[in-house]
């Protein structure tokens, strides 16, 4: 067991938000339940599983909220995926746009099915009020010890929103209200040093460095963007040097988180 400033991890391997959806599949072809790997790998073995970002209300984003698909509908599902997820050199470019079922449905349908996992719940909002509401719902519905932490996602490129003006107020209001340790997710495309200092000053337990890097992929024939949202977030091996640079700069700046 690892204690990271109050965040208890079973080991050092922590999944990133979205990769494993809500921690359990639902239906044979589950677009948003995701987690097909959970049919083959025991997710309890991870240090922690970071749940796909949830918002106060269900949100379609740039994808779909439809979860169950018949075999005949798979071509349509693949078309939607191509508009939200594209392979890139040494990585993936995604623009799901916080497509999610909403926090209430997560707690009703998925939370009870993943009790053996060490969960980090990623929260996304567009105002301090929304983050305060999300924290209040987590406090009410998640028993003590049932989450390793909550993650504040204020760095998503795919929702076309400027988080910079709200970050300080989000931290001042929502961090003290949370019964669980808070992780702040940093973007290498924003002023991450300033955001890290705000996090340190407002009681955040840890930083997630980094979120995806804003990128673009074009159709080589037409020159049109391949993603529905035009731009997307680049993840994978391609961004590891950027992540290491951000971590190094945070350390050089004296950030203790």
Regions found by a protein language model. Give the residues of each.
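Hydrophobic faces of well-ordered beta-strands that scaffold small-molecule active sites
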Residues: 13-16, 47-52, 119-123, 148-152, ...
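Active-site beta-loop-alpha junctions enriched in small/polar residues
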Residues: 18-20, 54, 124-126, 155-157, ...
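Glycine-enriched alpha-helix->loop->beta-strand junction motifs that scaffold or abut catalytic
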Residues: 45-46, 143-146, 179-180, 198-206, ...
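N-terminal capping/small domains of soluble enzymes
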Residues: 1-119, 125-129
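Catalytic cores of alpha/beta
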Residues: 26-37, 129-140, 190-202, 249-253, ...
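Glycine/Thr-rich beta-alpha phosphate-binding loop at enzyme active sites
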Residues: 92, 154-166, 195-255
């Amino acid at each position: 067991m690892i204690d990271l400033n109050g965040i208890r991890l079973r080991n050092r391997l922590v999944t990133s938000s979205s990769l494993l959806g809500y921690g359990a599949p639902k239906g044979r072809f589950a677009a948003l339940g995701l987690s097909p790997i959970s049919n083959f790998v025991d997710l309890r073995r991870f240090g922690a599983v970071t749940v796909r970002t949830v918002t106060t209300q269900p949100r379609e984003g740039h994808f779909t909220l439809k979860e169950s698909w018949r075999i005949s509908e798979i071509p349509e599902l693949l078309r939607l995926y191509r508009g939200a997820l594209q392979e890139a050199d040494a990585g993936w470019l995604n623009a799901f746009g916080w497509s999610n079922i909403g926090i209430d449905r997560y707690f009703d349908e998925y939370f009870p099915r993943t009790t053996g996992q060490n969960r980090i719940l990623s929260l996304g909002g567009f105002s301090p009020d929304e983050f305060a509401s999300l924290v209040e719902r987590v406090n009410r519905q998640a028993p003590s010890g049932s989450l390793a932490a909550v993650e504040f996602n204020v760095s998503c490129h795919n929702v076309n929103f400027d988080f910079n003006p709200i970050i300080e107020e989000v931290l001042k209001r929502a961090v003290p209200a949370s019964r669980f340790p808070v992780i702040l997710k940093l973007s290498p495309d924003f002023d991450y040093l300033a955001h890290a200092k705000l996090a340190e000053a407002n009681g955040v337990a840890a930083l997630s460095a980094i979120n995806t890097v804003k990128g673009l992929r074009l159709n080589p024939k037409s020159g049109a963007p391949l993603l529905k949202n035009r731009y997307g977030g680049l993840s994978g091996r391609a961004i590891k040097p950027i992540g290491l640079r951000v971590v190094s700069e945070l350390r050089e700046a004296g950030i203790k988180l």
